[in-house]
């Protein structure tokens, strides 16, 4: 059987031009509105080794965006608001290979109550997700050793997050058009 997760991984490998990774172990992140998972892919097996214990990254982005009056799904508009804004330092909640994203919601509500601008809140939201994914990636590479990292899912089409992860981890990314559901399979 070809799982939903396997479909995202195959589409990501194909669109990133790294199908040959199937021949060796690699890490894969699937980060979207429906899931935020860290997967170990080896010998044709996909095993979940980490991810969120509560909200997904996409849910957090959309909830913040809706609160800011953006159209759902909110990722692209939130990113536009965040462009060129230096975000406040994010303190993601990551233990090992598990993250908690729900705290972001409380922080953005507090920022709104403090009268912070939509742009500042958008930039902080993206920075929180970026910092969370960076910490998870670093922890996974420390635990499993150096190996390629693949990023897929709608949230990974955010240019701010992609550029940071490309620079820090030389990750491969699904093209945005291959990051949606049913991109493969």
PLM feature segments, named:
Residues 79-149, 155-174:
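A contiguous, well-structured pocket-lining segment that forms one wall/lid of small-molecule binding clefts
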Residues 20-24, 29-32, 36-119:
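A short helix-loop
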Residues 1, 30, 153, 176:
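Small/polar loops that bind or transfer phosphate-bearing groups
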Residues 9, 33, 154:
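Active-site glycine-centered loops adjacent to acidic/histidine catalytic or metal-binding residues
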